Amino acid sequence: MANSITHNTATVSASLNEDSLTESRLPTINDYLELCKIKVVALLVLTALVGLALAPDMGRGYFVQLLSLFGIGLLSSSAAVINHIVDSKIDAKMVRTKNRPLVRKAVSRRQALIFSAVIGTLGFSLLVFAANWLTAQMTLFALVGYAFVYTMFLKRATPQNIVIGGLAGAMPPLLGWISETGQLAAQPWILVMIIFTWTPPHFWALAIHRKADYAKAKIPMLPVTHGTDFTKTCILLYSLLLTVVCFLPFLIHMSGYLYLFVAMLINIIFIYKAVALKLSETSYGALNLFKYSILHLTLLFIALFADKFLM
């Protein structure tokens, strides 16, 4: 692990010495927004909002709560930028990522690194002053887990990269909860478990669709190392496990019947799509399942939020 991280750190450091042509033009706002993976971060912030909303009301006020969510979003964006920096050479080899800002030299690595440091520092500071030290520390822990442990090591080291590294991306509901209460509790870990269980089938579906890309980039995603059919089986098994985990908020009285109805409906569809993918002799359904999984998680957390305030 140490050798892998050292190699990637050296690669990033060496890459900072880019030609002056790249830095002679200023990146656009859209370039920086693309580095932040805004759509991904928006979903993370949504899950953090739900964690905050389900926490006991500590009377902190909406503005302070908004600042806390903004801080979580900024640190998540900072991690996304680091991911772009570390993965730029891999991104250049893959169809899905070959037009990212660092690959097309719209942003230099130095500019990206400075940007990541600035928004990361701002996000951490917001969490310290608007939330509490525990939230700031836990969010920083999640950033390190995703940007360094997962991106620099796990992603390149094992086909279980998504399973192990998925914990960092599953943390926002817990972060939202502790930003309100300042304490760890059992309930938000249920929400973490949902995202943690959702992550493997979500990314494995994409990995099936982009199997050739990952193989070309020498990333040991499960379809590359164990084959497409085995990965389809794993997706199906995880979809069943996800369904069970999604019922936990209702079973422990974190939610009511509105959430239960939505969870049942969207998980039945998830399982149906996973079964269809497994039985298919092709991989055409993989992209469809990947896209649906994003809608699934979005609707699930919206249902949790709505159940809290409408029922």
UniProtKB/Swiss-Prot annotation:
Q: What pathway annotation does it carry?
A: Porphyrin-containing compound metabolism; heme O biosynthesis; heme O from protoheme: step 1/1
Q: Which InterPro entries match?
A: Protohaem_IX_farnesylTrfase, UbiA_prenyltransferase, UbiA_prenylTrfase_CS, UbiA_sf
What function does the entry list?
Answer: Converts heme B (protoheme IX) to heme O by substitution of the vinyl group on carbon 2 of heme B porphyrin ring with a hydroxyethyl farnesyl side group.
Compartments, as annotated in UniProt: Cell inner membrane
| Gene behind the chain | cyoE
According to its record, what are the GO cellular component terms?
Answer: plasma membrane
The protein in question is named: Protoheme IX farnesyltransferase
Origin organism is Psychromonas ingrahamii (strain DSM 17664 / CCUG 51855 / 37)
Extra facts:
Carbon 2 of the heme B porphyrin ring is defined according to the Fischer nomenclature.
